[in-house]
A protein has these predicted regions:
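Compact integral membrane and secretory-pathway proteins
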Residues: 1-147
Length: 147
């Protein structure tokens, strides 16, 4: 008997995991910071990839989360049947990579690169935090399904 977890059905939890991983990858390339001085003085927003090396770490973690979510989804759809321990390990990998990515993004949200007094936060940071939370919740939902 399949239990419904945090996100309802296992397929829904898998879809949230995949969407969160993809959004986390995309967030790295969206603007993270915008200059406060105006367009004539400062060019448009800077993506996380351009702004900080932390974003490159987030990118790697996002790829790990996305691959884990895709393999879990293949297991849920019975395309690639996994052993219970393997599926649980992948779910924990999704949770851990999402949490660490969220912490890294949160750090850059709280402490932008210098000179920070001329920067405002942009959409990429906020999308990244939301995607990291979504990935962690999706991983936890997969773990709850397996109990």
């Amino acid at each position: 008997m399949t239990r419904t977890g945090l996100l309802g059905s296992p397929a829904r939890a898998s879809a949230v995991g995949i969407a969160s991983g993809a959004a986390l990858v995309a967030a790295v390339f969206l603007p993270w910071y915008q200059g406060n001085l105006g367009a004539p003085t400062v060019p448009g927003g800077r993506s996380g990839w351009e702004s900080t090396t932390v974003a490159k770490g987030v990118f790697v973690l996002a790829l790990v989360a996305l691959v884990a979510a895709l393999v879990i989804a293949a297991d849920v759809a019975d395309v690639v049947p996994l052993e219970r321990r393997t599926a649980e390990s992948l779910a924990w990998l999704l949770v851990a990579s999402s949490i660490v990515a969220g912490i890294l993004i949160g750090y850059r949200l709280a402490r932008p690169p210098g000179p920070a007094e001329f920067l405002s936060r942009d959409i990429g940071l906020f999308l990244g935090v939301a995607a990291a939370v979504g990935g962690a919740v999706a991983g936890l939902a997969q773990l709850a399904r397996r109990e």
